[in-house]
């Protein structure tokens, strides 16, 4: 992923958590704050295993986001996997995450400044 698409900095993370909206699914939680540019961060805690496993989850979630980000509203995204993600096969949760982005895209519209859908 290009460096310019990464969400970085404690200040930006705090703003997204405090002022942003939340969309929850069975396997991920996505925080969103409308902004003029599109940036993303995937936060995977240590409870998901060693660094190799966490980085794999991070890469797969980023891949799902990259496949759909052109159709999502501009803003800051923080993607957090839920622990239920570990209890199912990879293809199941990947399809559910992609489905979440498609439903979010449909609910918000491409140029919508804010998404209020809760899935």
Curated annotation (Swiss-Prot):
One of its GO terms (molecular function) is 3'-tRNA processing endoribonuclease activity. InterPro entries: Ribosomal_Su5_D2-typ_SF, Ribsml_uS5_D2-typ_fold_subgr, RNase_P. GO terms for biological process: tRNA 5'-leader removal. The keyword tRNA processing applies. It catalyses: Endonucleolytic cleavage of RNA, removing 5'-extranucleotides from tRNA precursor. It comes from Coprothermobacter proteolyticus (strain ATCC 35245 / DSM 5265 / OCM 4 / BT). One of its GO terms (cellular component) is ribonuclease P complex. Keywords: Endonuclease, Hydrolase, Nuclease, RNA-binding, tRNA processing. It comes from the Bacteria. RNaseP catalyzes the removal of the 5'-leader sequence from pre-tRNA to produce the mature 5'-terminus. It can also cleave other RNA substrates such as 4.5S RNA. The protein component plays an auxiliary but essential role in vivo by binding to the 5'-leader sequence and broadening the substrate specificity of the ribozyme. This is Ribonuclease P protein component. Consists of a catalytic RNA component (M1 or rnpB) and a protein subunit. PANTHER family: RIBONUCLEASE P PROTEIN COMPONENT (PTHR33992:SF1). Its EC number is 3.1.26.5. Belongs to the RnpA family.
């Amino acid at each position: 992923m290009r460096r310019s698409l990464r969400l970085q900095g404690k200040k930006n993370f705090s703003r997204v958590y405090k002022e942003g909206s939340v969309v929850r699914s069975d396997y991920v939680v996505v925080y969103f704050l409308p902004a003029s540019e599109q940036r993303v961060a995937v936060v995977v805690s240590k409870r998901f295993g060693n660094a190799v496993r966490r980085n794999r989850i991070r890469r797969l979630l980023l891949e799902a986001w990259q496949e759909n980000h052109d159709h999502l509203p501009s803003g800051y995204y923080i993607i957090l996997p839920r622990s239920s993600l570990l209890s199912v096969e990879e293809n199941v949760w990947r399809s559910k995450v992609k489905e979440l982005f498609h439903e979010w895209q449909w609910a918000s519209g491409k140029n919508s400044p804010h998404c209020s859908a809760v899935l």
